[in-house]
């Protein structure tokens, strides 16, 4: 099995990073899907998308995204990235990404000032749950 790892050069270039997606699914049909820079560019993207048979036969986005903000010495650094009409992006959190690795657990490494932050997204296989851990 092969795993993907991308460095800062690719991650900060949106033309290269936005077409690359990560998809994790579980046994109940739930999934988590987005681009490698966590920018939802498609209708089916979301951190937690689950089928709700009580409503209909469709998947429903329960959690679209989660944007972290690092506050260091009174300054705010938004790590999120959203695309709006006309190819406008805000905030531009991808500029803090240093590395993305999909080895077992999708992991993104950020560097904000003198702080290095690791984000891991663990998708549960037997429950409709996503766990996001920052260290």
Region annotations inferred by a language model:
Residues 1-135:
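Terminal accessory carbohydrate-recognition/targeting modules of carbohydrate-active enzymes
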């Amino acid at each position: 099995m092969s795993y993907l790892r991308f460095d800062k050069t690719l991650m900060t270039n949106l033309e290269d990073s936005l077409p690359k997606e990560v998809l994790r699914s579980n046994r109940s049909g739930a999934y988590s899907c987005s681009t490698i820079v966590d920018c939802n560019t498609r209708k089916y993207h979301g951190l937690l998308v689950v089928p709700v048979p009580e409503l209909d036969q469709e998947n429903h986005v329960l959690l679209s995204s989660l944007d972290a903000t690092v506050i260091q010495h009174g300054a705010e650094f938004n790590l999120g990235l959203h695309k709006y009409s006309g190819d406008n992006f805000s905030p531009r959190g991808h500029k803090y990404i240093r590395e993305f690795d999909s080895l077992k657990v999708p992991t993104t490494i950020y560097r904000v000032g003198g702080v290095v932050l690791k984000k891991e997204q663990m998708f549960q296989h037997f429950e409709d749950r996503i766990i996001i851990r920052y260290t």
